[in-house]
Amino acid sequence: MLKIKNIRSVCKRFKKTASCNKFKYKKSNLRHILTKKSTKRKRKLRIKSFATKGDKKLILRCLPYK
């Protein structure tokens, strides 16, 4: 029987919380071209976010062994 593999890109982007109920991820748009973005916008982008219920199902399908 073949082993089901984790999708590596999903492993790198999402981290499971300690309670195993949520997946944490970093918001995009904070790598380059930061001069035109306001300080408030950059500060809000630094905060980690949690995946929605719909995304959680997709993430769990991509991570069978997590």
From Swiss-Prot:
Q: Name the NCBIfam families on file.
A: rpmI_bact
Q: Which domain of life is it from?
A: Bacteria
One Pfam family of this protein, by short name?
Ribosomal_L35p
Q: Which residues constitute the signal peptide according to the record?
A: none
Gene field? rpmI
Alphabetically ordered keywords of this record: Ribonucleoprotein, Ribosomal protein
Q: Which GO terms describe its cellular component?
A: ribonucleoprotein complex; ribosome
Q: Which family does it belong to?
A: Belongs to the bacterial ribosomal protein bL35 family.
The record ties this protein, via InterPro entries, to:
Ribosomal_bL35, Ribosomal_bL35-like, Ribosomal_bL35_CS, Ribosomal_bL35_sf
Q: Which one of the record's GO molecular function terms can you name? A: structural constituent of ribosome
What protein is this chain from? Large ribosomal subunit protein bL35
| Provenance organism | Wigglesworthia glossinidia brevipalpis
- Gene Ontology BP annotations: translation
